[in-house]
Amino acid sequence: MSRYRGPKLRITRRLGALPGLTQKQSKKKGRPGQHGKSNEADNSKKTTEYGIRLEEKQKLKFNYGLTESQLYRYIKEARRRKGVTGLILLQLLEMRLDTICFTLGFAPTIASARQLVNHGHITVNDNVVSIPSFQCQINDVIGIKPKATSKNLVEGNLQTIKQVDLPTHLKFDKSKQEATVINYCDRNELLLNLDELLVIEYYSRR
């Protein structure tokens, strides 16, 4: 399945805030497609066990901009590793290069961070990496390609994006405009409101 490229606010009206997808908020009330009608039937559908798990899975998929096959590969990798599967899944996604660039404020969304990486503007340990899904490791240094075009693009984003406190697994050096990965992400610092256990349960029969 291809990556979603439709209206972002339609998704956030249905699933709630997805910081990796968009920072904008819809002025419309209710879920898309209701047109002012009662949402009793919709709520009934939503509250089935399958419906709840599906919605949590969709949150993860849209927030990180993944295809269904990509998400399932991360699920399988998280299962393979020792530890709490749900936490490992989130750590894998947060260690993606495009996610880290978004978290640092190099780009306003994960989708735009993906383009930033694709176009060769980002370095890892002084080497240009153009693979958005690249798995960063502890002690990796994430920087900007030393060219005016790259620096102007990222610095412009850093000045305009409303940056919240940086999570503790990243350390940013403003003077060098680079960040060091110092740990795996802390579950309590993630901006996405999600029950990852329900995502794991959704895929439990696959």
UniProtKB/Swiss-Prot annotation:
It is found in: Plastid, Chloroplast. InterPro entries: Ribosomal_uS4, Ribosomal_uS4_bac-type, Ribosomal_uS4_CS, Ribosomal_uS4_N, S4_RNA-bd, S4_RNA-bd_sf. It comes from the Eukaryota. Residues 37-50 have a biased composition (Basic and acidic residues). SUPFAM superfamilies: Alpha-L RNA-binding motif. Residues 1-50 are annotated as: Disordered. It holds the Pfam family S4. Its main location: plastid. One of its GO terms (molecular function) is structural constituent of ribosome. Gene3D superfamilies: Ribosomal Protein S4 Delta 41, Chain A, domain 1, RNA-binding S4 domain. Residues 1-13, 25-34 have a biased composition (Basic residues). Keywords: Chloroplast, Plastid, Ribonucleoprotein, Ribosomal protein, RNA-binding, rRNA-binding. One of the primary rRNA binding proteins, it binds directly to 16S rRNA where it nucleates assembly of the body of the 30S subunit. With S5 and S12 plays an important role in translational accuracy. Part of the 30S ribosomal subunit. Contacts protein S5. The interaction surface between S4 and S5 is involved in control of translational fidelity. NCBIfam families: PRK05327.1, rpsD_bact. PANTHER family: 30S 40S RIBOSOMAL PROTEIN, SMALL RIBOSOMAL SUBUNIT PROTEIN US4M. Belongs to the universal ribosomal protein uS4 family. This is Small ribosomal subunit protein uS4c.
